[in-house]
Amino acid sequence: MATTRKPRGGAGGATQPALDFDAPGEIVCGVDEAGRGPLAGPVVAAAVVLDPARPIVGLDDSKALSAKKRERLFDEIVAHALAYSVASASVEEIDSLNILHATMLAMKRAVEGLSVLPTLAKIDGNRCPMLAIRSEAIVGGDALVPSISAASILAKVTRDRTLVELHQQFPMYGFDAHAGYGTPQHLAALREHGPCEHHRRSFAPVREAFDLIR
């Protein structure tokens, strides 16, 4: 899973619009993830370089927004950002690396997928992935830094859409309702049907469900 946007520019290699500078010459991207806690599906990360000439009203932590507003802002970010990239780490990578390292991998892939090379990555949380550029971890950054808010929205909407698609293949789990989180409905379905290939075997409730069917 990877989606990127190229920078805008006129014919003949016209210069790009002014970038999101923290300091002269600084190009900042915001980075966030969605899906660390669920029992199923990939962890998704996004990186966004916003265009200060085209501000987006209403950016916030994706968890504080309604699904309808997230979808609207998703379209605005895709249309107005100077660059964005969405990447993921698979269930297999989550199980082999652990969820923390898989999350860092997804973030690294998202930053490396940007078509504009940033000089600074602002990461939501208290850890940064290993990057070739400087990075800064900001706890609660998805509610404080607009570019991180934008990344939060892209990651959340992309992951939710992925789980809706998985629901079409495995309707018995109700992925469209809980996006893979360990709700009572999901746990009951795990006990009744056992896990599917998209469940994270390294997570305790899934391991326990596997043990029940052995």
UniProtKB/Swiss-Prot annotation:
GO molecular function, one term: RNA binding
Main location: cytoplasm
Domain of life of the source: Bacteria
Lineage, highest ranks first: Bacteria, Pseudomonadati, Pseudomonadota, Betaproteobacteria, Burkholderiales
Binding site for a divalent metal cation: D32, E33, D124
Natural source organism: Burkholderia pseudomallei (strain 1710b)
UniProt-recorded name of the protein: Ribonuclease HII
Cellular location(s): Cytoplasm
PANTHER family per record: RIBONUCLEASE H2 SUBUNIT A, RIBONUCLEASE HII
Manganese among keywords: yes
Stretches assigned to the RNase H type-2 domain: 26-214
The keyword Cytoplasm appears for this protein: yes
Gene3D superfamilies: Ribonuclease H-like superfamily/Ribonuclease H
GO biological process, one term: mismatch repair
Record-level GO cellular component terms: cytoplasm; ribonuclease H2 complex
InterPro entries: RNase_HII (IPR022898), RNase_HII/HIII (IPR001352), RNase_HII/HIII_dom (IPR024567), RNaseH-like_sf (IPR012337), RNaseH_sf (IPR036397)
EC id: 3.1.26.4
